Amino acid sequence: MGARASVLSGGKLDAWEKIRLRPGGKKKYRLKHLVWASRELERFALNPGLLETPEGCLQIIEQIQPAIKTGTEELKSLFNLVAVLYCVHRKIDVKDTKEALDKIEEIQNKSQQKTQQAAADKEKDNKVSQNYPIVQNAQGQMVHQAISPRTLNAWVKVVEEKAFSPEVIPMFSALSEGATPQDLNAMLNTVGGHQAAMQMLKDTINEEAAEWDRVHPVHAGPIPPGQMREPRGSDIAGTTSTLQEQIAWMTGNPAIPVGDIYKRWIILGLNKIVRMYSPVSILDIKQGPKEPFRDYVDRFFKTLRAEQATQDVKNWMTETLLVQNANPDCKTILRALGQGASIEEMMTACQGVGGPSHKARVLAEAMSQVTNTNTAIMMQKGNFKGQRKFVKCFNCGKEGHIARNCRAPRKKGCWKCGREGHQMKDCTERQANFLGKIWPSSKGRPGNFLQSRPEPTAPPAESFGFGEEMTPSPKQEQLKDKEPPLASLRSLFGSDPLLQ
C-alpha cells in the first residue's frame, strides 16, 4: 500500500485531503482513494505510474473520457479522481470534484482552439490553389494549370461508353470542378462523335448567352481605371475573352465565377441531350411481374435522373410513381408500409418478392381461391350434394346398412327373384325394362318399335279427282268405329291392328 500511496506527499497530500467529494459534502479525498485508483488502472490495463505526473493524468483523462457516457459508475469515479489529482499536481485551487471537472473542461477547450488555429495557419501556409485549375505560384500570383490529358481521356471514354446516358452529367460536373471557360471548351472539343448532340448543346449555350446579355446590359460610359469590364455572354462562353480575363474575373474582388456560369449552361444543354438519348418517360417505367424490386428501383432512378424537373417534383415522383408502377405483389406490400417509407424500408420489405418461396405462397393462395370459387358455384347450381347417399339392405329392405351387416334373419333364396336354389349373383332372371318387358326379347324387336313395316300403297284415286268416289267397305267402317282416340300411340304398346 505504501508504493501505491506514494503518488502524493507533503503539501500536495495536504491539498488532496482538503478537497471534498461532492459540493457541500462532508466526505473528502483520502489516501485510500489513490490506492483504489491504482488498482482500477491495473484492471483497465493502464499504467498506475501515470498518476504521479500531471502529463500522465492528462493521458489517462484522454483515454477514459470517450467511454464516460457508456461507462460504469466505477469508470466515472476514476475519471473524476484523476481530474482532481491533475489539479493538485498543477496546484490549481479547487474545493470539490465539480470545480476540478470544470477546470479540466476549460483547459481542454483552450487546447482544442490552439490546435485548430495551428492547423488553419499550417493549411494557409501550405495552400497552393484557391480554385483549381487556377493555382497560386510561389510569388503569390494566380496562374492557370491546363486541364490534364488524363481528365480529357476520362471524359471522352465516358461519352463513348455511356453515349449521353443520365450518368454523364455528374461525371462531367466532377471532371470540370473549378475549370475555366477555356478548359470547358477543351472538354467539349474532344468529343469526336455525336455531332448532332453537340450542335444541340451549342444552341443551348447561345440561348443562355443571349439571355445573360438581356439581363445584364452594358453600363454606359467609360470603365473606371483599374476596374475590369463586365463579362458578356460570349465572354462567359470563352469565345471573346482571353484566359487572363477569365482568371481575373474568377479571382477578382468581387469575383465573377464565369467558369461556374458556363458550366451551368453546359449542364442545361446536356440535360436536353440526355432527354433526347433517353426517350423513355418516367411514367413508362413499370415493374415486370417477375422483375426483382431492386432492378425496378435501379431503372426508375436512372430514368428519373434524365427528367428535367425540380427536386420537389422528383421527390413527388419517387413517393407516388415508385409505388404506383410496382407489380401487384410489391404494391400490396408498399401500400402496407404507408406514406413516408424510405427506399431502404421498401427494398427490405420487397426483398423476397419473386423468389421461389413467394411464388409458392402466391400459387397456394390462387389455388385456394379457385377451389373456394368452384365450390361456391357448385353449391349455387345445386350440384353439390351435401348429404351422403344412404345404402339399402337387400336382406331386410331397410336403409342405413348393407346385407353383410344386417342383424335380421337371413332371407332364403335369391334376393332378386325370391326363388330358392340359387343366389342373386347366379340369378338368370333378367331385369325388366321400363315397358315391363325383358330386354332383349326373343320375339324380335322391342315393343316400342314397329313390329312390321307396312308396304307403301298408292293414295286413293278420289284424292286426285280420278273416277268416282269409292264406297267404303263394311269392314273398314267397323274398324273406323273402333279406332281409339290416340291411334298413333298404339305402336308403342303392342301390335298395331291397322298395320296388320
From Swiss-Prot:
A lipid is attached at G2 (N-myristoyl glycine). One of its GO terms (molecular function) is zinc ion binding. The record marks Y132, P133, L363, A364, M378, M379, N433, F434, F449, L450 as: Cleavage. A motif (PTAP/PSAP motif) lies at residues 456-459. Residues 189-227 are annotated as: Interaction with host PPIA/CYPA and NUP153. Keywords: AIDS, Capsid protein, Host cell membrane, Host cytoplasm, Host endosome, Host membrane, Host nucleus, Host-virus interaction, Lipoprotein, Membrane, Metal-binding, Methylation, Myristate, Phosphoprotein, Repeat, RNA-binding, Viral budding, Viral budding via the host ESCRT complexes, Viral nucleoprotein, Viral release from host cell, Virion, Zinc, Zinc-finger. The keyword rRNA processing does not apply. Residues 217-225 are annotated as: PPIA/CYPA-binding loop. InterPro entries: Gag_p24_C, Gag_p6, Lentvrl_matrix_N, Matrix_HIV/RSV_N, Primate_lentivir_Gag_pol-like, Retrov_capsid_C, Retrov_capsid_N, Retrovr_matrix. Pfam families: Gag_p17 (PF00540), Gag_p24 (PF00607), Gag_p24_C (PF19317), Gag_p6 (PF08705), zf-CCHC (PF00098). Residues 73-77 are annotated as: Interaction with membrane phosphatidylinositol 4,5-bisphosphate. Residues 8-43 are annotated as: Interaction with host CALM1. A zinc finger (CCHC-type) spans 391-408, 412-429. A motif (Nuclear export signal) lies at residues 16-22. Gene3D superfamilies: 1.10.1200.30, 6.10.250.390, Human Immunodeficiency Virus Type 1 Capsid Protein, Immunodeficiency lentiviruses, gag gene matrix protein p17, Single helix bin, Zinc finger, CCHC-type. Residues 109-118 have a biased composition (Polar residues). HIV-1 lineages are divided in three main groups, M (for Major), O (for Outlier), and N (for New, or Non-M, Non-O). The vast majority of strains found worldwide belong to the group M. Group O seems to be endemic to and largely confined to Cameroon and neighboring countries in West Central Africa, where these viruses represent a small minority of HIV-1 strains. The group N is represented by a limited number of isolates from Cameroonian persons. The group M is further subdivided in 9 clades or subtypes (A to D, F to H, J and K). Late-budding domains (L domains) are short sequence motifs essential for viral particle budding. They recruit proteins of the host ESCRT machinery (Endosomal Sorting Complex Required for Transport) or ESCRT-associated proteins. p6-gag contains two L domains: a PTAP/PSAP motif, which interacts with the UEV domain of TSG101 and a LYPX(n)L motif which interacts with PDCD6IP/AIP1. Belongs to the primate lentivirus group gag polyprotein family. This is Gag polyprotein. The gene is gag.
